[in-house]
């Protein structure tokens, strides 16, 4: 990947995404901020549209966390956190680098002190949704970054949170 190839950031206005955009630009990378409202109906055509731009990498910083989801919210969370990343991975060219933001919630309540190759043991719907995504990201150009982020949402939130 070279600096002429743009990096697309999905979820560019969220808690993690806006910081990723800022850091990449500070380092001199060309960044495309995606503001697409991803749905099961538009996912594959929109991903193909990204491919047509000949992007060098896609950073999936989207995510949904719902403490006590009802059935409809749970379905939405499973789609954004679990199913969408697997579709993204399968639809992008195998040569396009995909960096996916996951969570230590894949390890459940024993998340503290886990290693990257420990077995999954989610104990929440959120953790399970992140496991679904990780299992769908297969190949050398598919990277997973697990983090435990706690803080306000979006670019206009207080700058006193963990990443800023």
Where are these regions (language model features)?
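NAD(P)H-binding glycine-rich loop region in Rossmannoid oxidoreductase-like domains
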Residues: 40-80
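SDR active-site strand-loop-helix element
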Residues: 10, 34, 61-62, 98-104, ...
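Conserved Rossmann-fold NAD(P)-dependent oxidoreductase catalytic core, especially the SDR/UDP-sugar
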Residues: 86-121
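A short beta-strand-loop structural module common to alpha/beta enzyme folds
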Residues: 30-40
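N-terminal Rossmann NAD(P)H-binding glycine-rich loop of SDR-like oxidoreductase domains
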Residues: 2-26
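Glycine-rich NAD(P)-binding loop of the Rossmann-fold in SDR/ketoreductase-type enzymes
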Residues: 72, 76-84, 116, 120, ...
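NAD(P)-dependent short-chain dehydrogenase/reductase
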Residues: 135-164
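Conserved catalytic-core motifs of eukaryotic protein kinase domains, centered on the activation segment
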Residues: 68-75, 109-112, 155-156
């Amino acid at each position: 990947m070279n600096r002429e190839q743009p990096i697309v950031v999905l979820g560019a206005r969220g808690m993690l995404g806006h910081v990723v955009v800022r850091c990449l630009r500070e380092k001199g990378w060309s960044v495309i901020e995606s503001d697409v409202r991803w749905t099961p109906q538009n996912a594959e055509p929109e991903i193909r549209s990204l491919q047509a731009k000949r992007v060098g990498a896609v950073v999936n910083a989207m995510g949904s966390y719902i403490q006590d989801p009802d059935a409809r919210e749970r379905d939405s969370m499973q789609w954004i956190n679990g199913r969408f990343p697997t579709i993204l991975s399968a639809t992008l060219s195998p040569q396009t680098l995909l960096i996916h933001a996951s969570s230590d919630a894949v390890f459940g309540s024993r998340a503290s002190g886990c290693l990257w190759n420990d077995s999954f043991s989610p104990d929440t719907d959120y953790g399970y949704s992140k496991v679904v995504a990780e299992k769908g990201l297969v190949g050398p150009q598919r990277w997973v970054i697990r983090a435990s982020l706690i803080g306000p949402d979006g670019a206009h939130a207080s700058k006193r949170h963990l990443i800023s």
